[in-house]
């Protein structure tokens, strides 16, 4: 039998979490993401709404975002509305109808935003079939074309 003290267990747990969180931040971004975000950040306030635990500001692209809201901060998970309500608080004078939410999950992103009156774009790089009863939004798979697509759709 192997026994550890509570302080040893805490050290082990912290070490394990640090390994996990460091691995969690070993992400390779899709081609064109950085350029698209740089371009969009010149004209729009950008934010991250995530159910995950990666910190956008640990990445080079973090500099393009004005805010990031995790489930920890929202005290909830998408598709519930807490992330979106908090986003409203981050940008003065904006309403849901003036927002655009870009996401890859049909329920947690598209449905969640759509039901609040937020415009949506679906990142569909796997050419997935639309499986929802509500109308499929415009979709894209090439980040290099995103700024032009947004300009055409919403300007």
Question: Predicted regions span which residues?
Answer:
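Asp-based, Mg2+/Mn2+-dependent phosphohydrolase catalytic module
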Residues: 34, 38, 44-155
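Alpha-helix C-capping/helix-to-loop hinge sites
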Residues: 2, 23, 71-72
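Short, acidic loop-to-helix structural element flanking the phosphoryl-transfer center
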Residues: 9-10, 18-48
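Helix-loop "lid/cap" segments that line or gate small-molecule binding pockets
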Residues: 1-7
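Conserved acidic, metal-coordinating active-site core of Asp-based
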Residues: 15-25, 67, 94
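Short helix-terminating capping/connector loops at secondary-structure junctions
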Residues: 7-11, 94-97
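Hydrophobic side chains within well-formed alpha-helices
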Residues: 12-16, 61
């Amino acid at each position: 039998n192997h026994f550890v003290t509570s302080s040893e267990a805490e050290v082990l747990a912290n070490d394990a979490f640090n390994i996990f969180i460091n691995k969690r931040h070993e992400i390779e971004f899709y081609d064109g993401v950085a350029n698209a975000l740089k371009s969009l950040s010149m004209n729009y306030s950008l934010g991250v709404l995530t159910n995950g635990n990666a910190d956008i500001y640990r990445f080079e692209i973090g500099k393009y975002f004005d805010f990031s809201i995790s489930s920890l901060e929202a005290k909830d998970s998408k598709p519930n509305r807490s992330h979106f309500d908090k986003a409203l608080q981050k940008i003065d004078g904006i309403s849901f109808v003036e927002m655009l939410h870009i996401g890859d999950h049909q329920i947690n992103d598209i449905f969640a935003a759509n039901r609040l009156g937020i415009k949506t774009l679906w990142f569909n790089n796997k050419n997935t079939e639309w499986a929802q009863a509500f109308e499929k939004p415009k979709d894209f798979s090439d980040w290099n074309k995103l700024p032009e697509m947004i300009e055409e759709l919403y300007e």
